[in-house]
């Protein structure tokens, strides 16, 4: 059973609306649904909300480190609460998926995502679940044949139409979460992947 859901993003008001903070957006909606509130926890280098799911503790974590150091936060909480990699779901922005698309995946590479790289380094394994929220790739949006800088792209706010699609993918992820949390990962994946 999943004991920890991590949303990836960067701290600070200046990053609140960045595409790179899609994981934070997901956790903010989930915490509200679970009537949980985030509290700063220095020992975990992040903001933590604790909820109950089917009588079990469920931790929600938003690292307060910058994206590249997310593993420091995840590792600290997992060691303290004895949470294994298989009991973790990391919610992340995904350049290689179009806005409006969400995908569940166990393990695999990092796709160049620095937050995932650091988590993998701290957990010593890639074998944890990821919920990938599509934000699109700048090569798909430039339109004028010139490449757009990826770092610049992820640290910008999406256009309104894109934001609506990302919000829809967050909603789709939340809809399959009960199936996922009770361990029916295959059905959760099939339902989510059929939605776009």
From Swiss-Prot:
Provide the binding site for tRNA: 15, 66, 68, 114
Task: Report keywords, A-Z.
Answer: Cytoplasm, Hydrolase, RNA-binding, tRNA-binding
Indicate yes or no for the key word Cytoplasm.
yes
Q: Which PANTHER family match?
A: PEPTIDYL-TRNA HYDROLASE
Q: Does the keyword Hydrolase apply?
A: yes
Family stated for the protein in its record: Belongs to the PTH family.
Record Gene3D superfamilies: Peptidyl-tRNA hydrolase
Catalysed reactions listed for this entry: an N-acyl-L-alpha-aminoacyl-tRNA + H2O = an N-acyl-L-amino acid + a tRNA + H(+)
Kindly state the subunit structure of this protein. Monomer.
What role is this protein assigned? Hydrolyzes ribosome-free peptidyl-tRNAs (with 1 or more amino acids incorporated), which drop off the ribosome during protein synthesis, or as a result of ribosome stalling. Catalyzes the release of premature peptidyl moieties from peptidyl-tRNA molecules trapped in stalled 50S ribosomal subunits, and thus maintains levels of free tRNAs and 50S ribosomes.
Q: Where is the active site?
A: 20 (proton acceptor)
Compartment(s) of residence:
Cytoplasm
From the record, give the transmembrane residue ranges: none
**Alphabetical list of Pfam families matching this protein:** Pept_tRNA_hydro
One GO term of the biological process aspect: rescue of stalled ribosome
- Say which species the protein is native to: Polynucleobacter asymbioticus (strain DSM 18221 / CIP 109841 / QLW-P1DMWA-1)
EC numbers listed for it are 3.1.1.29
The record's GO molecular-function terms, alphabetically, read: peptidyl-tRNA hydrolase activity; tRNA binding
Which gene is transcribed and translated to give this protein?
Answer: pth
CDD domains cross-referenced by the UniProt entry: PTH (cd00462)
Where in the chain is the site Discriminates between blocked and unblocked aminoacyl-tRNA?
10
| SUPFAM superfamilies, sorted | Peptidyl-tRNA hydrolase-like
- For this entry, the protein name equals Peptidyl-tRNA hydrolase
């Amino acid at each position: 059973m999943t004991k920890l859901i991590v949303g990836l993003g960067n701290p600070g008001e200046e990053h609140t609306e960045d595409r790179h903070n899609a994981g934070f957006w997901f956790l903010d909606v989930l915490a509200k649904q679970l009537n949980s509130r985030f509290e700063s926890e220095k020992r975990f280098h992040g903001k933590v909300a604790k909820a109950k799911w089917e009588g079990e503790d469920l931790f929600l974590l938003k690292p307060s480190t910058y994206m590249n150091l997310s593993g420091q936060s995840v590792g600290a909480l997992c060691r303290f609460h004895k949470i294994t990699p298989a009991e973790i779901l990391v919610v992340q922005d995904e350049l290689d998926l179009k806005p409006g698309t969400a995908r569940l995946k166990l393990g695999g590479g990092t796709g160049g995502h620095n937050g995932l790289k650091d988590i993998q380094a701290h957990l010593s394994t890639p074998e944890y679940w990821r919920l990938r929220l599509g934000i699109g790739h700048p090569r798909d949006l430039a339109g004028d044949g010139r490449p757009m800088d990826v770092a610049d792209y992820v640290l910008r706010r999406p256009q309104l139409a894109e934001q609506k699609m990302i919000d829809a993918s967050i909603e789709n992820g939340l809809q399959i979460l009960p199936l996922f949390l009770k361990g029916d990962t295959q059905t959760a994946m099939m339902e989510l992947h059929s939605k776009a």
